[in-house]
Amino acid sequence: MSEVKSRKKPGPKVAAPEPEKRSDGRKNPEARGGAGWADPRTGLSLLSLATSLGLAWLVFQQSEKFAKVENQYRLLQTESSEFQGLQSKISLISNKLESTENTLQEATSSMSLMTQFEQEVAGLQRSIHDIENSEEMLTQKLQNLNEKFQNITDLWKRTLVEMSDNTAVFKSEAKSTHSEVTLKINSAEQEIKLLTERLKDLEDSTLRNIRTVSRQEEEDLLRVEAQLSSDTKAVEKLEEEQRTLLARDEDLTDKLSSYEPKVEECKAHLPTIENAVHSVLRVSQDLIGTERKMEELTVQMFNMEDDMLKAVSEIMEMQNTLEGIQYDNSLLKMQNELVVLKGKVHDFMAYSSAGEKGTLEEYNLENKGTDDY
């Protein structure tokens, strides 16, 4: 017994520096393992940053496109004001037609006024052609704007679908990282339990075989201590990784919460854009109706020109026939025929003015309906 005790006492003094050497020798592979864990973490963080930057860039582009849509809507408003200017031109044309009645009344004094009347009719024809050309340009612009609005709405819908897909991907990544962390923690706990059980077994075996294999037990204890130190370091590294993964999970949740109000804003702007598209379509339909009405007015103007030419030819024939008749009879007949012509012109002007008022009232009612909508 005394010999066994004397052997045990000097043993630890000699073998004390050996675990330090072994622990120093095992630091390098553990450090290498930590570098290996850092590479996928940095890659995942870079991927998340790249995706967040891409999403921010998409949102910025969509805001720029929405600003362009607003500018195009303002252009539509300016074009509607130009259309009101065309309506004022039509009212001026009606005023000119009323002035033609006065010129017909003054036709008894001299035939030179007839040439002026023909010039005014030609000017009216030119103004009508200009109005038709401007209306064609407006219809083309409205068609182009309708196509642009439809393209923009399609782009908004696509971006919303992409945003929802990206949020789902972020959620799945966060869940996967959380599950990986929990698995690593559980595995580390199981390893610690196994090590504690091994320590108990080793202690029991040392108590049983302390007399026979003291040196072997000391070596086993040194190995176990080295393993414990390495395992504790591994556990500390796993805890650090758990902290980093939890911080990353929090960052991902914050990013998701920051993207959700942007998605809701996009969804809130969609109905306004759709209402604008519907209003533009209605305005285009109203313009088509006004074009038809303007075509009817041009037909009426051509008929009026034919009637005026017929009246001029009749007046010339009357002058030729009245050259051989007395002066008094010629004046009476001329007055009667001019009264008849005035009546015809007055009836035609009343009919044309009534048709124009009806078309303008219908257009105003349709515009009120679109504004109420």
Swiss-Prot record:
Post-translational modification: N-glycosylated at Asn-151.
Chain coiled-coil ranges: 64-257, 290-325
Cysteines paired by S-S bonds: none
Record's protein name: Inhibitor of nuclear factor kappa-B kinase-interacting protein
Biased composition (Basic and acidic residues): 18-30
Native source species: Rattus norvegicus (Rat)
Renumbered residue ranges of the record's region Disordered: 1-38
Function: Target of p53/TP53 with pro-apoptotic function.
Source organism phylogeny: Eukaryota, Metazoa, Chordata, Craniata, Vertebrata
Entry GO CC: endoplasmic reticulum; endoplasmic reticulum membrane; nucleolus
Domain of life per record: Eukaryota
Other remarks in the entry: Shares a common promoter with APAF1 from which the 2 genes are transcribed in opposite directions.
Topology in membrane: Single-pass membrane protein
Glycan attachment sites: 151
Compositionally biased spans, kind Basic residues: 1-11
Major localisation: endoplasmic reticulum
InterPro entries: Inh_kappa-B_kinase-int
Localization per Swiss-Prot or TrEMBL: Endoplasmic reticulum membrane
Keywords: Coiled coil, Endoplasmic reticulum, Glycoprotein, Membrane, Transmembrane, Transmembrane helix
Record field: transmembrane: 43-59
